[in-house]
A protein has these predicted regions:
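Short N-proximal segments of mature Sec-exported proteins
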Residues: 27-108
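Bacterial N-terminal signal peptides
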Residues: 10-20
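Sec/Tat signal peptide C-region and signal peptidase I cleavage site
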Residues: 22-26
Length: 118
């Protein structure tokens, strides 16, 4: 019983640490990266910029990139579960590779999926 309590305390402490690390990093609004006309150059956006924005903005951009790639590949349907998983994987990749362009991260992910790596 004592071991279970210790494990529970350790898990709670680890969760709190992870949450504090995520929150401690400044989140930047997407409008910071927009030009004076309100446009965002999606080809120039870096993984650091994606990873440092608010989660809902990162998810929105992920959905946009997904649609962009599906259009590029001439696909006219979506698998929502796979798209959400892909968006999550790209965001995680971007957090680990901040200097990479988001379009390159998405391209790498698409190639991985096409090769059967998912």
């Amino acid at each position: 019983m004592l071991g279970r309590v210790d494990l529970r305390v350790a898990l709670i402490a680890a969760s709190a640490l992870i949450a504090s690390v995520s929150v401690s990093q400044a989140q930047v609004e997407l409008k910071t990266y927009m030009d004076d006309k309100g446009y965002l150059n999606v080809r120039a956006l870096t993984c650091a910029q994606l990873a440092n924005t608010f989660q809902e903005d990162a998810d929105f951009l992920g959905a946009w990139y997904s649609g962009w790639w599906n259009g590029h590949l001439k696909r006219h349907s979506i698998n929502p579960a796979r798209a959400k998983q892909g968006i999550h994987e790209v965001i995680v990749y971007c957090k680990a590779n901040p200097d990479t362009k988001v379009v390159d991260a998405v391209d790498d992910y698409v190639k991985k999926v096409q090769a059967g790596g998912q």
